[in-house]
């Protein structure tokens, strides 16, 4: 009796269902794909808008093959990828995996399927295929991007999870584009279908995302990658800038004592703030606004009269901004206060920036946004100079910025406060020509109580994790170890194209740089890069964990790029002096955030 044939020799030459090679299937595909006509049948769906996408159902020929592939994947090491753009788990490229069925699948894509794909799509391909497996758990996502990089020509996804539904999240969302070719809204969503292959040509408008997974007891499993081909000529027009609406200081005179906790406008306290800003480029001042005023503002923010407008483009940002003409009266006064020369003067005193015009050539200005945030909102890492010059509008970074860090809450001695109070009636922090009338002492304010709060805040911060994240660091190696850029580079170690998903966000860095060289570069940048001052006030954040949805200031090209974490805190005034190449990134808001929160963000320019 002859010996039984080895299992590897029993395998079919391909694991793909035969029906895709039939004349009828290929005629059907050709008629609808190339004529941009929609069709949906048992084994095929073609979507023509916003860009052409094909889904083939029952793609692998048997359930046994699918089970073998999934079993082999269980033994493949995954890594956790976390960045502003994405959060999920991923294997290395299958070119480096030698298990039986995964190797067969990879070889089939590299040979038979490449030939078939090139023939039916008329897209020129070579034999290079990038392939890996991804797994998305609860709160994982991959935000808006176009895959349009290098020699990628056709993107594909093979779905491995059974019984997936729309209520589980994780859909493949397709974006339409505006008149500038930038992503706008999700107009089509494909629910992951077990044993289906979805593919589309990588083009200038192939913007898509993996929506956040919201199932707590399921994982979204897939095999994905790209077919590669010759480089195409770049035909995309330059990416338009997002132009802020710059506002010059209004000659309105504001009585700050109506709004601000009094100690923060005492000259001695102002001087202390200035020292801290000069040293650390950052401050976080607690209980900055009067409690009753802050509470009324918080209520006003929930008014149905406010008109909110979503802002994009989706590959840069997704949140809502208030129409200032629709704000309730008190909130409108508060909003407009930040345009006033009074606030410009106060911020000049806090920072010594040239925010008050003293000559005709000086032109201080500001921009302001009242933002509403909820589940699904985000901003992404994007370099200003790259957006101005790049035809592709890639999210790559080219600038160096100086190290910045935080300010601990002010601690002022009792004696100094008494001295300040005695001199307060005759001395104003504002210049005589540009600011409101001098502010006088107010016996209604309990100075001792305010100072106790400040000291208590400092004490609590010194024993918290946030203090570690916000305190000044002596070297780059001591910056927050979970910074996005560090994670990306520690996880993405393969040479494979699949492993380079981080290339959407950054250029490779020379990791051999010594700390001294890095610090020298930062010092050089510090003397040459123009700066601006961010002012941040947050509302309705008490329902969130303090470190859950921080606003991060990131140097995109620095090895450990996160410089500052701004925690979510109500009634705090945050000041950050930043260089213009610094990116302000607000973390993606997951489905566990069930209420709105608000940011008033102003940026002041000398």
Label for each model-derived stretch:
Residues 2-606:
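Fe(II)/2-oxoglutarate oxygenase catalytic core
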């Amino acid at each position: 009796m002859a010996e039984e044939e080895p299992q590897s020799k029993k395998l079919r030459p391909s694991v793909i269902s035969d029906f895709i090679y039939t004349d009828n299937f290929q005629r059907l595909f050709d008629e609808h794909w190339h004529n941009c006509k929609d069709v949906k049948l048992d084994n095929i769906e073609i979507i023509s808008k916003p860009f052409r996408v094909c889904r083939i159902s029952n793609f692998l020929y048997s359930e046994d093959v699918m089970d073998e592939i999934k079993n082999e994947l269980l033994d493949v090491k995954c890594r956790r990828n976390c960045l502003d753009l994405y959060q999920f788990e991923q294997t290395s490229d299958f070119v480096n995996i030698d298990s039986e069925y995964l190797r067969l699948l990879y070889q089939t894509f590299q040979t038979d399927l490449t030939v078939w794909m090139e023939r039916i799509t008329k897209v020129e391909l070579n034999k290079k295929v990038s392939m890996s497996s991804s797994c998305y758990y609860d709160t994982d996502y991959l935000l808006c991007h176009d895959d349009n990089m290098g020699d990628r020509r056709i993107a594909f996804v093979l779905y491995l999870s059974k019984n997936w539904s729309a209520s589980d999240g994780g859909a493949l969302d397709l974006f339409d584009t505006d008149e500038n070719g930038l992503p706008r809204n999700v107009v089509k969503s494909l629910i992951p279908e077990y044993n289906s292959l979805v593919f589309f040509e990588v083009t200038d408008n192939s913007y898509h995302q993996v929506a956040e997974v919201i199932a707590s007891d399921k994982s979204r499993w897939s095999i994905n990658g790209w077919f590669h081909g010759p480089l195409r000529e770049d035909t995309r027009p330059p990416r338009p800038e997002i132009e802020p609406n710059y506002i010059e200081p209004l000659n309105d005179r504001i009585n700050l004592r109506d709004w601000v906790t009094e100690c923060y406008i005492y000259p001695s306290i102002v001087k202390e703030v200035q020292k801290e800003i000069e040293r650390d480029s950052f401050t976080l001042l607690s209980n900055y606004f009067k409690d009753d005023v802050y509470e009324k503002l918080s209520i006003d923010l929930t008014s149905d009269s406010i008109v909110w407008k979503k802002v994009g483009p989706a590959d840069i940002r997704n949140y809502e901004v208030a129409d200032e003409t629709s704000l309730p009266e008190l909130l409108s006064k508060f909003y407009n206060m930040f345009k006033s020369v009074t606030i410009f003067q106060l911020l000049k005193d806090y920072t010594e920036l040239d925010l008050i015009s003293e000559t005709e050539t000086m032109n201080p200005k500001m921009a302001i946004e009242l933002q509403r945030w909820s589940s699904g909102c985000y901003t992404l890492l994007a370099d200003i100079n790259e957006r101005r010059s790049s035809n592709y509008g890639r999210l790559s970074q080219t600038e160096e910025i100086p190290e910045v860090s935080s300010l601990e809450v002010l601690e002022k001695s009792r004696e100094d406060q008494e001295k300040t109070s005695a001199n307060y009636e005759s001395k104003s922090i504002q210049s005589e020509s540009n600011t409101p009338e001098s502010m006088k002492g107010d016996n209604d304010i309990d100075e001792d109580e305010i100072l106790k709060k400040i000291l208590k805040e400092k004490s609590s911060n010194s024993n918290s994790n946030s203090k570690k994240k916000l305190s000044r660091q002596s070297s780059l190696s001591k910056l927050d170890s979970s910074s996005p850029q560090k994670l990306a580079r520690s996880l993405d170690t393969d040479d494979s194209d699949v492993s380079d998903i981080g290339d959407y966000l950054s250029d490779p860095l020379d990791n051999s740089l010594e700390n001294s060289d890095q610090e020298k570069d930062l010092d050089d940048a510090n003397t040459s890069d123009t700066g601006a001052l961010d002012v941040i006030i947050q509302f309705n954040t008490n329902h969130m964990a303090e470190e859950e949805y921080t606003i991060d200031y990131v140097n995109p090209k620095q090895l450990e790029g996160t410089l500052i974490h701004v925690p979510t805190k109500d009634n705090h005034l945050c000041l950050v002096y930043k260089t213009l190449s610094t990116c302000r990134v607000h973390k993606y808001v997951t489905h566990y955030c069930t209420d709105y929160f608000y940011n008033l963000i102003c940026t002041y320019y000398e």
